[in-house]
Amino acid sequence: MANIKSQKKRILTNEKARLRNNSYKSELKTLIRKVDAAVESGNKDAAAETLRTASRKLDKAVSKGVLHKNTAANKKSGLAKKVAKI
């Protein structure tokens, strides 16, 4: 455990951020699974709609600092390729 007051505060804020980021990442994974499920079912409209939602959330995660911009770009392009194959 840290002895310095500011470091004790940083430990608390880091824990809050970690929990927030984990819940956000979990939501992203769920959206990505929904896109994959829509692609598997062959429903192009549903796949396109869920892809749009997932892309927005991925961009938001980048702006909030949850994901690196290249990670989000790779995920978005991979999902777009899957949807385009339908």
UniProtKB/Swiss-Prot annotation:
<dbReference type="InterPro" id="IPR036510">
    <property type="entry name" value="Ribosomal_bS20_sf"/>
</dbReference>
<keyword id="KW-0694">RNA-binding</keyword>
<dbReference type="GO" id="GO:0005829">
    <property type="term" value="C:cytosol"/>
</dbReference>
<dbReference type="GO" id="GO:0070181">
    <property type="term" value="F:small ribosomal subunit rRNA binding"/>
</dbReference>
<dbReference type="GO" id="GO:0003735">
    <property type="term" value="F:structural constituent of ribosome"/>
</dbReference>
<dbReference type="Pfam" id="PF01649">
    <property type="entry name" value="Ribosomal_S20p"/>
</dbReference>
<keyword id="KW-0699">rRNA-binding</keyword>
<keyword id="KW-0689">Ribosomal protein</keyword>
<comment type="function">
    <text>Binds directly to 16S ribosomal RNA.</text>
</comment>
<keyword id="KW-0687">Ribonucleoprotein</keyword>
<dbReference type="GO" id="GO:0006412">
    <property type="term" value="P:translation"/>
</dbReference>
<protein>
    <recommendedName>
        <fullName>Small ribosomal subunit protein bS20</fullName>
    </recommendedName>
</protein>
<comment type="similarity">
    <text>Belongs to the bacterial ribosomal protein bS20 family.</text>
</comment>
<dbReference type="InterPro" id="IPR002583">
    <property type="entry name" value="Ribosomal_bS20"/>
</dbReference>
<dbReference type="GO" id="GO:0015935">
    <property type="term" value="C:small ribosomal subunit"/>
</dbReference>
